[in-house]
Amino acid sequence: MTSKNPIQKALYLTFERAQWSELRDSVPLTLSERDLENLRGINEKVSLSEVTDIYLPLSRLLNLIVKSKQQRGLVLDEFLGQKPFHSPYIISIAGSVAVGKSTTARVLQALLQHWPEHPKVDLVTTDGFLYPLADLKRKGLLQRKGFPESYDMKMLVEFISAVKSGQPHTKAPIYSHVTYDRVRNQHQIVSQPDILILEGLNVLQTGLDSPVDTRRPFVSDFVDFSIYVDAEESLLKQWYQERFLQFRKGAFSDAKSYFHHYANLTDDEANAIAANIWDTINGPNLQLNIQPTRERAHLILQKGQDHLMSHVLMRK
């Protein structure tokens, strides 16, 4: 996967799994198997060895980068003769549906908050910034859910701008995967974290590839370090179908679930519906909007079979 892409060869240093794991440099493992169980997503197989080989070196890299940014901030404050200004370091995590962005974000949050330089690490997903279900239906965007135009980008940019500017309390809307909708009158409060992890499909997008107004700022303008979780599309489709089957047995069985009508499908019926959703919505969104932003990331995590990381690509 890595050797066939000339752009990646030009822009990135490529590490095989074993090479990357050596960069851990004795960073202690602070997660137990029980901790990891709480962090895993549906159909995710991330193990303690995956944490040790991939995520501990990454947390060490991010710690060094954040410390450097903090030290630079102190130098600027001294030069300008002003009181220290607290601006959260913002990490974005992008990638396709079913690639495991959420698990990556949760594991990184758990590891990064153990470093003394940045103990307060918040995690926000962009799902909450999807337009409410009623608005999507009214705009004719229900079959485009997850595409850039299905997000309230003005609200998302205002949120990330407020966090970056050091606002003491900033509200983020909460999304329910049961009702398939934004939760009314409930918010996540972000209160001046040391690090904010922002996870979502389109967080690497810029005005170059936006189908909407390009004159306004984009989320990527506020991000300090960006990560793209990558995999071949054939694997992504397979993982999406497997996850759909898991949801059918779990979340879809809830009578309140928007997808409750899928709960009694046979395996063959569920696989066919999941494949169609991929081919008509998730696949085109990946090809048109998500994958083209991949080479903007500072770091690419490449997955192979069984969700295992095979390579790490780091910007030169």
From Swiss-Prot:
Catalytic activity: (R)-pantothenate + ATP = (R)-4'-phosphopantothenate + ADP + H(+)
UniProt-annotated binding residues for ATP: 95-102
Subcellular location(s) per record: Cytoplasm
Keyword Nucleotide-binding: yes
UniProt-recorded Gene Ontology molecular function terms: ATP binding; pantothenate kinase activity
GO biological process: coenzyme A biosynthetic process
UniProt keywords, alphabetically: ATP-binding, Coenzyme A biosynthesis, Cytoplasm, Kinase, Nucleotide-binding, Transferase
One family name in Pfam for this protein: PRK
GO cellular component: cytoplasm
Alphabetized HAMAP family for the sequence: Pantothen_kinase_1
Family the entry assigns: Belongs to the prokaryotic pantothenate kinase family.
Protein known as: Pantothenate kinase
Organism the protein comes from: Shewanella sp. (strain W3-18-1)
Lineage of the species this protein comes from: Bacteria, Pseudomonadati, Pseudomonadota, Gammaproteobacteria, Alteromonadales
